[in-house]
Amino acid sequence: KYNNVKIENGSLAHYNNDKKRWQLLFAHERTGLHELTVYAKRNNNNESSSRSVVRFDLDVNKLRRPMKFPLIYSQFHTKKCQIYTPLDGVLKKGSIVPIHCIVPGATEVNLTVDSQWLNSEGYTDPILQRQITVGSSDIVIYAKYEQKSNYNGLVKYSVR
């Protein structure tokens, strides 16, 4: 929070597959005092809501480059995915961007650019690594699991 307002896409929780633990990242857009609250729940807990487990006050006195993380869908956390690059959730129109993520256990991983499916390439379980040319609207990473015919959304990037 900044001035008691939640920062949209200002944090990213992803599973560090090398260290076998969750990693929490924070992206601030302004200098000043920020309140970081971590919410959690146990995997075997049937409750739908998480509860606050720790709170940090962070005083940001220098801003190098403001950013937002991409929008993360629930399947990203359920499947313990991880983003290496790009961490910035807002991509520049027309730029060529490397995509590097860990997507464990998927049978297929693909992307849409401007709502158009790309050729499926660059995924060998658990690594997705490829380059894309950013279009004029959203980029979404999808994964298929087991014998299911539908894709689940994992990560959504916006375009400026």
List each language-model region with its residue ranges.
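Mixed-charge, low-complexity segments
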Residues: 1-160
